[in-house]
């Protein structure tokens, strides 16, 4: 299922990317500079989800320890994003012990207990071949449910998540070579004449030893994000707007005809 | 440090609270100065408090030896030509009689009227309408009645209007000034030369004033309504002209692109099977140029979020139009049941969202054009009633109101499931019984 959806995404991106890529390829042939590090008009995107899951502690809850919560950054389908992200720095509230938490291995999450809701900053640092600049995300910790009618329960946690994509325009060749065919990334289709160097085996071996993010302890509570619903909404809205545009154009042409008749009459 | 730099690069509004405390300026102490006339010992007794009553200057006293009396005395008035003597009461001090002229004689002012000789009249002042006797009489009356032309017209032996009298008087004065001057430059700054009397304009001004003063209340209301209607039509035409201006600038951009011979950038919108109509090409070219520059600036950042990119695109498209139009676009999006910010901002969703915004802008522009043409048509029809009295009024096309409320809005709640990507089909037929549903928020 994952492979088919990713291939479909690549198919969707194909008509946009092919012509500029061919053009950039021609430019490269003209320059005959094979050492060029970055590919133009290609962008890699990494779908991510960041948010928190909070459990009420029930009878054990006290004034200052009412919830046990976890804040995290994960791949959209729980893929391992450590091929891109080197470490994540979580900035918690200053009242916590060591409020700055650095997580250098997946899963990139922080588990804590407390009573307050506050803003958490998450700074993503990437590998050297990916990007030198870190990227900051901001999430407001949510412990209490929106609807006040239901009583607090230990069985159902409060889950608040946001979907986004990290976009890397002009990625480097080594980055492309390292992450090709990885499920965590949306990979554009390269031109047929272009060949990437073979990936190194050492990194593959190293990757297998790391923690597996597929079997996450909180995986059952994660939200699923589907673009199909939103695309349907947008398509229906566009159809309505286009119908109105056509109607208004007909009315304008009718009025123009009538105004011309009136002008001709006045001229006579 | 890294976080701050990232915030600056991404343009996020995460500014810390400014705790700058302004220094309080010290109020200056008021120094109480000892008032004059009071001794230092007396002022010290008051303790610096301002005195409640002003100090009385006891040194100044009216002189006791002065003698004042009122007497009935006669006086002469130099303003009169005869030697009439009148009497009035006069204040006499120390038996000294008053001297000097009558105190009110100084208010007898007279206008300086130019005089002309018979020789000057023959050389410069002859006129086909006015005789010399009439002109002499006019100037005598101007002297006697101090240029009050209404009174002069009433007393004048020949029947002439106020404007005619004024015109003769001022033209004679201008001719005399011009004749007596050494050169034309000497009298160029004279008021009579700079601002000559215009008999035609004076007549028109009085006629208009008379009409305004004599018009009825009903006519006044009617005039106000006509002016308001004219103002509204003018504003509509200006708005329509302003709406058409972006097309011109878009064409200029297209020309620049052709001159450079460089494609502005990769197309943001996905490849669509249906071609855009001709009228829609110009605004898309405008937004295309903005998109190209925004894409270039996004590429400068080595990494960015998809939501940030979408925000930049929306801002670039919005910069070309006004704030009211932006509000209307967003209101339309809400009426259609679409999120102002996509919940799942993938590349495809963002591109569709931008296309929708562009089409809504086109729709709003067409609405403005329709309103403008309707008002134009109605104004033409009113003007042509005399030429075509049989034109029926029923042929006016009433515009359909732009409201999506009547139509059923599409609002789907997002389905939330466990881990694993959801199938592309919007409604899967079979659900796994083992997976638990997440709590709906």
Curated annotation (Swiss-Prot), chain A:
Parts forming coiled coils: 229-263
Entry's localization field: Cytoplasm; Nucleus
Polar residues: compositionally biased ranges: 1-20
UniProt KW Protein transport keyword: no
Keywords of this entry: Activator, Chromatin regulator, Coiled coil, Cytoplasm, Developmental protein, Differentiation, DNA damage, DNA repair, Flowering, Nucleus, Transcription, Transcription regulation
Source species, domain of life: Eukaryota
Function: Negative regulator of flowering controlling the H4K5 acetylation levels in the FLC and FT chromatin. Positively regulates FLC expression. Component of the transcription factor IID (TFIID) complex that is essential for mediating regulation of RNA polymerase transcription. Component of the SWR1 complex which mediates the ATP-dependent exchange of histone H2A for the H2A variant HZT1 leading to transcriptional regulation of selected genes by chromatin remodeling.
Family indicated by similarity: Belongs to the YAF9 family.
Protein name: Transcription initiation factor TFIID subunit 14b
Curated annotation (Swiss-Prot), chain B:
Taxonomic placement: Eukaryota, Viridiplantae, Streptophyta, Embryophyta, Tracheophyta
Organism of this sequence: Arabidopsis thaliana
Pfam families xrefs: DMAP1, SANT_DAMP1_like
Subcellular location: Nucleus
Location (main, coarse): nucleus
Renumbered residue ranges of the record's region Disordered: 1-38, 244-277, 373-441
GO term, biological process aspect, one: chromatin remodeling
UniProt gene name: SWC4
Ranges of biased composition (kind: Polar residues): 268-277
Subunit structure and binding partners: Component of the SWR1 chromatin-remodeling complex and of the NuA4 histone acetyltransferase complex. Interacts with EAF1A, EAF1B, TAF14 and TAF14B.
SUPFAM superfamilies to which the protein is assigned, alphabetical: Homeodomain-like (SSF46689)
Gene3D superfamilies the UniProt entry points to: Homeodomain-like
Domain of life assignment: Eukaryota
Record-level Gene Ontology MF annotations: DNA binding
UniProt similarity note: Belongs to the SWC4 family.
Protein name per UniProt: SWR1-complex protein 4
Regions of compositional bias (Basic residues) in chain numbering: 429-441
Gene Ontology cellular component annotations, sorted alphabetically: NuA4 histone acetyltransferase complex; nucleus; Swr1 complex
UniProt KW keywords: Activator, Chromatin regulator, Nucleus, Transcription, Transcription regulation
Compositionally skewed regions (Basic and acidic residues) per UniProt: 21-38, 373-383
């Amino acid at each position: 299922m994952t492979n088919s959806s990713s291939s479909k995404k690549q198919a969707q991106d194909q008509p946009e990317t092919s012509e500029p890529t061919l053009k950039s390829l021609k430019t490269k042939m003209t320059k005959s500079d094979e050492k060029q590090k970055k590919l133009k008009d290609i962008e890699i995107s990494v779908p991510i989800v960041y948010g928190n899951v909070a459990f009420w502690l029930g009878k054990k809850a006290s004034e200052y320890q009412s919830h046990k919560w976890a804040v995290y950054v994960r791949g959209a389908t729980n893929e391992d994003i450590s091929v891109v992200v080197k470490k994540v720095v979580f900035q918690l509230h200053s009242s916590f012990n060591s409020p700055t938490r650095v997580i250098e291995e997946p899963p990139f999450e922080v588990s804590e207990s407390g009573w307050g809701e506050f803003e958490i900053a998450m700074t993503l640092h990437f590998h050297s071949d990916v990007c030198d600049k870190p990227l900051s995300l901001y999430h407001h910790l949510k412990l209490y449910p929106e609807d006040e009618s239901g009583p607090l329960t230990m069985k159902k946690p409060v889950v608040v998540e946001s979907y986004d994509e990290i976009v890397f325009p002009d990625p480097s060749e080594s980055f492309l070579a390292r992450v090709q065919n990885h499920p965590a990334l949306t990979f554009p289709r390269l031109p047929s004449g272009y060949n990437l160097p073979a990936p190194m085996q050492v990194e593959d071996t190293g990757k297998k030893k790391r923690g597996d993010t597929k079997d996450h302890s909180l995986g059952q509570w994660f939200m699923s994000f589907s673009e199909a619903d939103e695309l349907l909404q947008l398509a229906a809205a566009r159809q309505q707007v286009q119908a109105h545009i056509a109607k208004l154009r007909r009315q304008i042409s009718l009025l123009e005809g009538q105004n011309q008749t009136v002008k001709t009459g006045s001229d006579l | 440090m890294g976080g701050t730099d990232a915030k600056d690069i991404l343009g996020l509004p995460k500014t810390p609270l400014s705790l700058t405390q302004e220094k309080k300026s010290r109020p200056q102490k008021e120094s109480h100065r000892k008032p004059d006339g009071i001794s230092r010992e007396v002022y010290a007794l008051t303790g610096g408090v301002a005195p409640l009553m002003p100090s009385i200057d006891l040194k100044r006293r009216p002189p006791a030896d002065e003698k004042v009396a009122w007497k009935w005395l006669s006086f002469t008035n130099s303003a009169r030509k005869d030697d009439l003597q009148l009497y009035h009461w006069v204040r006499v001090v120390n038996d000294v009689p008053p001297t000097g002229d009558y105190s009110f004689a100084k208010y007898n002012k007279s206008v300086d009227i130019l005089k002309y000789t018979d020789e000057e009249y023959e050389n410069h002042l002859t006129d086909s309408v006015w005789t010399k006797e009439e002109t002499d009489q006019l100037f005598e009356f101007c002297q006697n009645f101090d240029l009050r032309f209404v009174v002069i017209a009433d007393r004048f032996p020949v029947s002439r209007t106020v404007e005619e009298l004024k015109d003769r008087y001022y033209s004679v004065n201008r001719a005399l000034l011009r004749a007596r001057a050494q050169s034309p430059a000497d009298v160029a700054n004279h008021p009579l030369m700079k601002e000559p009397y215009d008999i035609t304009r004076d007549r028109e001004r009085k006629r208009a004033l008379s009409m305004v003063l004599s018009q009825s209340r009903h006519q006044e209301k009617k005039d106000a309504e006509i002016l308001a209607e004219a103002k509204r039509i003018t504003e509509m035409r200006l708005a329509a002209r302003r709406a058409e201006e972006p097309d011109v600038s878009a064409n200029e951009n297209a020309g620049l692109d052709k001159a450079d011979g460089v494609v502005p950038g990769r197309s943001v919108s996905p490849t669509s099977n249906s071609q855009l109509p001709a009228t829609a090409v110009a605004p898309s070219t405008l937004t295309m140029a903005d998109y190209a520059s925004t894409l270039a600036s996004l590429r400068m950042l080595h990494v960015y979020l998809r939501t940030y990119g979408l925000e930049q695109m929306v801002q670039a498209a919005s910069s070309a139009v006004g704030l009211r139009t932006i509000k209307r676009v967003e209101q339309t999006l809400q009426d259609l049941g679409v999120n102002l910010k996509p919940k799942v901002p993938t590349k495809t969703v963002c591109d569709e969202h931008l296309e929708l915004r562009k089409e809504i802008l086109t729709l709003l522009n067409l609405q403005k054009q329709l309103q403008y043409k309707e008002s134009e048509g109605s104004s033409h029809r009113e003007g042509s009633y005399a030429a075509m009295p049989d034109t029926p009024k029923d042929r006016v096309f009433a515009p359909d109101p732009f409201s999506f409320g009547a139509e059923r809005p599409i609002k789907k709640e997002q389905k939330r499931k466990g881990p694993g990507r959801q199938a592309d089909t919007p409604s899967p037929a079979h659900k796994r019984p083992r997976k638990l549903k997440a709590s709906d928020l």
